[in-house]
Amino acid sequence: LKKLRATTALAVVVAILGLGLGACGSSSDEGGERTTLRAVYAGFPDYLDPALSYTLEGWTALWNSYLPLLTYAHANGAAGTKIIPGLAEALPQVSDGGKTYTLILRPGLMYSDGTRVRASDFAHTIERLFRVSSSGSPFYADIVGAEHFAETKQGGIPGIETNNKTGRIVIHLNEPRGTFENELAMIFAAPLPSGTPAEDLTAHPPPATGPYVITAVKPGRSWEYERNPEWLSNNAKLLPQLPSGHVNQIDVTVVRNTSTEVNDVEQGRYDWMQNPPPTDRYAAVKDKYEGTQFRTAPQINLYYFWMNTKTTPFDDPEVRRAVNYAVNPAALERIFAGQLTATQQILPPGIPGYKKFVPYPHDMAKAKAMIAAADPSDRQVTVWTDNYGQNKEAGEYFDGVLDELGFETTLKVINSDNYFTVIGNLSTPSLDTGFANWFEDYPHPSDYFAPQLTAAGIQPTNNTNWAQFDDKALSAKVDRLSREHLGPKQLAEYTALDRAYMRQAPWVPFGSLTLSTFVSDAIDLEDLVISPIFGQDLTSFEFK
């Protein structure tokens, strides 16, 4: 998705959001009921190793194979953000002022290779994150002893206590962490057998606990799923809260031309493309197939322009507010061909604490008057964006808005593969303003404040606070709230923070991208589940 301290991975999510799943037919389907889903991705996922994957495409691919102790409900919309027990019997007991989490592993669970799932596998899994330098390891760095283990790679992590006889898992944190249940539900933390090598296993993914196991991987080209042999005979009975899936096999092929994908799905050669149709065909596909073979679903993400609050002209809040008035989110909706829903606030739709408000209704005349009154001493501005799809056009639009406001602009368009690396390096010259987006790590409002709008996010490299915004009072509130469990009081405070940050206007938020799903006429679209976190749910695909 994605994010927190893994900025490069976020760039990948954005750069290849158009990806989906795919493959050719199976002879086992011929002459009988269809049991093989043929799907298409526009590009291969970053990894097919649960310790390493950090993109929406990878998480879609892995979600129904690697089950964490906690997980999310298999449901559309807000219902899909509810944390439920996964391999654990129940949600954790939290004690010691929020610093100790106790869970019990369900007895009798098996991996797809016939190995029994043990409590100690969880400890090994977290240790493996640090051994392979996973982008997900920072989420678990607050476990007692984790930072020392990250340096030495020896001796285990003392803050994780396990008992294989009872299934008891006790996790001790250095300090309370209100997001820790969400982090236990991330695919990074899905238990793997204790002997799993500390290396990238994309070509030969590790044994699975979920209904599908990944097989026959050809990196960069294709992979397949088969039913986990231990699922229906064993794990499904122990995990009744999780769906088993309808198809017996899923064949996935990479087809990099998205227009070709559309043709193939229309003609029934493939059953599903996860990525949206290309911009020049999106409206036609939507108009023809919406409700029968095409639908959109909200995803929790935010697209915005950041402004460097440390240097002129954007060190002046009045200038930043003026720019917010000048940008027209409706124009950006058109640029994104209807795939983006306009918004003007930090918290995106779907995240807890979100309450819609419109702080800066479009008013170019007012914006020009505010700039004239502020009279910034330096009007030379470099505008940054990447070259992927509509991101480039959005940057060009923003460049034009600033030009109309009287700034002397220089537009820099960077390859999407390293865009966030470049703007995340504070030694890069002229980091004045530019495009960014953020796909949630998990549905918690802290994810939109702590890494992007506090001092903690400002780093010499891998910087995620591109506005370099640090309001001491607001940062202190974010820090305090991030240690508390979400309740009505905390949600109200996050809602208030949204407004407080937008009064300071470090960003120009303009929209949230929706996820499009296009299937063949053989698929039952009505019952398809599109998770707001993981995308299309493989267990929900069913032939008519």
Description of each model-found segment:
Residues V40-D96, P207:
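N-terminal lobe/hinge region of extracytoplasmic solute-binding protein
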Residues I104, R116, D121-A123, R131, ...:
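Surface-exposed binding/hinge segments that line
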